[in-house]
């Protein structure tokens, strides 16, 4: 059964709708909803919750907070269903958006906590960047979980928000920090509703970029971003994400290059080479590396190829290789050694190389 209810009369539409999908979130909801109540934004605000077949006390907690929020002037729309199984994050977000009224959408996950300034600061930024997804910096809980990832999302430059969209880290501003206009969401969306195992945020982000959307980050830590084993992120298969990433690279970058070098003659570089279409593989002029053993080997032979003779790709020292590069070396892992090597070549990110690690 689908239900949607709103006790307040909708005489005036909200300026900002907070979009909150919920599935069995009882242990985090109080803190999450308290953070909605504590927003210092002075415009009309609405909370749109979609309860995706929760079997715990989530529904009762939402009902309790509905009263508190409406008493403080925040209207609340509750939708949901009580089918035996959940329909997934993409479906829930689409439903929460559809039942909401705000001109702007502020996405929130039920296990995260907003800082009081979040809606206000992102709303201001969205007014200046109407076709962008607005993100923000985050604080991780627990603090020592995913340190490299957290550093990456908090410190990308404004250019890198667009050039580093091919890495395994996914969207350069993370989904629970997204804020955008409803008009732009409708132009790009909706989210993929394939359910468990579908990286719906990544697919939406790619579609947003295809349509010429920008990416902007408010440089304040406006979200407490929780890491735990129940997170929906963990249900997405690495291979699924890999396939989408390779396809996006082949669509967005490789058509502009006549030839290129894959930086990393090891496992990741070879995996990328094998994952490319034949047309893209033919553009690979070399692998490059710093590992003397790999370089001494001289070449990589693609054994699984149907071609005769089988393709042999030279392996060079990075200083002897030709740009542009697709870089398959993980960032922030080699104590700065890789970053120094890359810097020594004086290349421009996005034009002379992209990161695909």
Curated annotation (Swiss-Prot):
<dbReference type="InterPro" id="IPR001173">
    <property type="entry name" value="Glyco_trans_2-like"/>
</dbReference>
<dbReference type="InterPro" id="IPR029044">
    <property type="entry name" value="Nucleotide-diphossugar_trans"/>
</dbReference>
<dbReference type="GO" id="GO:0141125">
    <property type="term" value="F:tRNA-queuosine(34) galactosyltransferase activity"/>
</dbReference>
<comment type="similarity">
    <text>Belongs to the glycosyltransferase 2 family.</text>
</comment>
<keyword id="KW-0328">Glycosyltransferase</keyword>
<dbReference type="GO" id="GO:0006417">
    <property type="term" value="P:regulation of translation"/>
</dbReference>
<comment type="function">
    <text>Glycosyltransferase that specifically catalyzes galactosylation of cytoplasmic tRNA(Tyr) modified with queuosine at position 34 (queuosine(34)). Galactosylates the cyclopentene hydroxyl group of queuosine(34) in tRNA(Tyr) to form galactosyl-queuosine(34). Mannosylation of queuosine(34) in tRNA(Tyr) is required to slow-down elongation at cognate codons UAC and suppress stop codon readthrough, thereby regulating protein translation.</text>
</comment>
<protein>
    <recommendedName>
        <fullName>Queuosine-tRNA galactosyltransferase</fullName>
        <ecNumber>2.4.1.-</ecNumber>
    </recommendedName>
</protein>
<dbReference type="GO" id="GO:0005737">
    <property type="term" value="C:cytoplasm"/>
</dbReference>
<keyword id="KW-0963">Cytoplasm</keyword>
<dbReference type="Pfam" id="PF00535">
    <property type="entry name" value="Glycos_transf_2"/>
</dbReference>
<dbReference type="GO" id="GO:0006400">
    <property type="term" value="P:tRNA modification"/>
</dbReference>
<keyword id="KW-0808">Transferase</keyword>
């Amino acid at each position: 059964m689908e239900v949607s209810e709103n006790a307040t009369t909708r005489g005036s539409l909200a300026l900002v709708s907070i979009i909150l999908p919920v599935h069995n979130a009882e242990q985090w909801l109080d803190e999450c909803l308290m953070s909605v109540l504590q927003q210092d934004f002075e415009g009309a605000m609405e909370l749109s919750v979609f309860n995706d077949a929760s079997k715990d006390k989530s529904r009762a907690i939402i009902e309790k907070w509905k009263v508190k929020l409406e008493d403080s002037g925040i209207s609340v729309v509750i939708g949901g269903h009580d089918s035996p199984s959940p329909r997934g994050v993409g479906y829930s977000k689409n439903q929460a958006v559809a039942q909401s009224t705000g001109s702007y959408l502020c996405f929130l996950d039920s296990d995260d906590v907003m800082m009081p300034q979040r809606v206000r600061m992102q709303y201001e930024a969205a007014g200046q960047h109407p076709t962008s997804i607005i993100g923000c910096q985050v604080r991780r809980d627990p603090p020592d979980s995913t340190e490299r990832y957290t550093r990456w999302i908090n410190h990308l430059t404004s250019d890198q928000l667009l050039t580093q969209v091919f890495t395994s880290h996914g969207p350069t501003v993370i989904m629970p920090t997204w804020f955008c206009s409803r008009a732009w969401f409708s132009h790009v969306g909706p989210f993929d509703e394939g359910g468990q195992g579908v990286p719906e945020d990544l697919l939406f982000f790619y579609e947003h970029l295809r349509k010429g959307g920008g990416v902007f980050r408010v440089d304040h830590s406006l979200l407490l971003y929780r890491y735990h084993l129940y997170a929906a992120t963990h249900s997405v298969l690495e291979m699924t994400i890999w396939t989408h990433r390779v396809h996006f690279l082949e669509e967005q970058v490789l058509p502009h290059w006549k030839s290129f070098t894959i930086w990393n003659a090891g496992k990741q570089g070879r995996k990328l080479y094998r994952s490319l279409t034949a047309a893209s593989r033919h553009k690979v002029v070399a692998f490059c590396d710093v590992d003397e053993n790999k370089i001494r080997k001289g070449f990589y032979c693609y054994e699984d190829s149907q071609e005769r003779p089988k393709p042999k790709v030279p392996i060079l020292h990075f200083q002897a290789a030709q740009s542009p590069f697709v870089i398959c070396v993980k960032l922030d892992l080699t104590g700065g050694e890789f970053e120094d090597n890359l810097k020594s070549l004086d290349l421009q990110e996005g034009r002379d190389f992209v990161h695909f690690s």
